[in-house]
Design a protein with these regions (language model features):
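Jelly-roll (double-stranded beta-helix
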Residues: 1-312
Length: 312
């Protein structure tokens, strides 16, 4: 057995998307090779409704899949297939855009105004770029989970972990998507298919991964009763850890424990032509997609009554 070393690490950066949603970009719009088959990941965590309520109005996608995982709050969604629904705490939506879909995602938060979730973009292989669009909406109660004797809790969103199968299936890159919470000062190892590329994203607490000499997390200084004291920021510091080759990931949680996503997939190793919400294999395919969008012929499969509007 070999522990996967850390190939690179970084912190998510603040940005704005949609109609003015404040979020943190974990990775994306750069070199896709280290993350193949994944393209982009965002962490949308906000307790200020004015910074997320304008949401992501109607917009197109082609050639990708989007995976939305909600921890807190609600996200209302609709699409050109006629789907309508609401994602709430713990729910997952896996959307395959395929040949083309137009949809909207409108976060509404919870009663306290809190909104927290993640969206991951996965590339589609060349022979599936123009497949029929589809949705998988998974309610929190349908997601497999297990708790080890040491208190480690694992939600299996996609893939297979120790015989627990994720509710999301039928995905070409056969991804593994685990939400893992480890109690304080605990060392764990997780199997990692050698054929896959993958990463961890820490969003609560701190931990050492593999060959790391210092914990990923954040110590902040706050004043209490006139005295400064160091405490562990339980929001985590939005740290991305990308792994090298090996068949296991080793993690030791910090003083306050850790919660992170462990995600992997089989690399496609195909050309990537990417502009905005559309990802194809060549510039010509990309240009054709935008021509169709502007001509009102983008959506190939729509709900009864759906009308393609040029430029939408």
């Amino acid at each position: 057995m070999s522990i996967r070393p850390i190939k690179m690490q970084s912190e998510a950066t603040p940005t704005m998307e949609g109609a003015g949603v404040h979020l943190h970009r974990v990775f994306g719009f750069g070199d896709t090779d280290p993350f193949d088959p994944f393209l982009m990941m965002d962490d949308f965590r906000n307790d200020t409704p004015s910074e997320y309520l304008k949401g992501f109005p109607w917009h197109p996608h082609r050639g990708i899949e989007t995976i939305t995982y909600v921890l807190k709050g609600n996200v209302e969604h609709g699409d050109s297939l006629g789907n309508r629904g609401v994602l709430s705490d713990g729910d997952v939506q896996w959307m395959t855009a395929g040949s083309g879909i137009i949809h909207q995602e409108m976060p509404t938060g919870n009663a306290q105004g809190q909104m927290h979730g993640f969206q991951l973009w996965a590339n589609l292989p060349r022979d599936q770029k123009m497949c029929t669009p589809r949705y998988q909406d998974i309610k929190s109660g349908d997601i497999s989970s297990l708790t080890d004797d040491d208190g480690t809790h694992i939600r299996v969103v996609a893939g297979d972990y120790r015989g627990y199968r994720g509710a999301v299936d039928g995905i070409d890159t056969d991804p593994s998507y685990l939400d893992i919470a480890i109690p304080p000062n605990t060392t764990k190892r997780f199997p990692f298919d050698t054929r896959r590329q993958g990463f961890a994203y820490i969003f609560e607490g701190s931990a050492n991964f593999g060959n790391a000499s210092t914990p990923f997390g954040v110590n902040v200084e706050k004043e209490f009763a006139g005295e400064e004291m160091k405490i562990r920021d339980q929001s985590g510091n939005r740290t991305l850890v990308v792994f090298g080759a090996g068949d296991e990931v080793e993690v030791t949680s910090g003083e306050m424990g850790v919660r992170f996503l462990l995600i992997s997939g089989a690399p496609l190793r195909e050309p990537v032509a990417w502009h905005g919400p559309i990802v194809m294999n060549s510039r010509a395919e990309l240009q054709e997609a935008f021509r169709e969008l502007n001509a009102g012929t983008f959506v190939k499969t729509g709900a009864d009554g759906w009308v393609n509007t040029p430029g939408s």
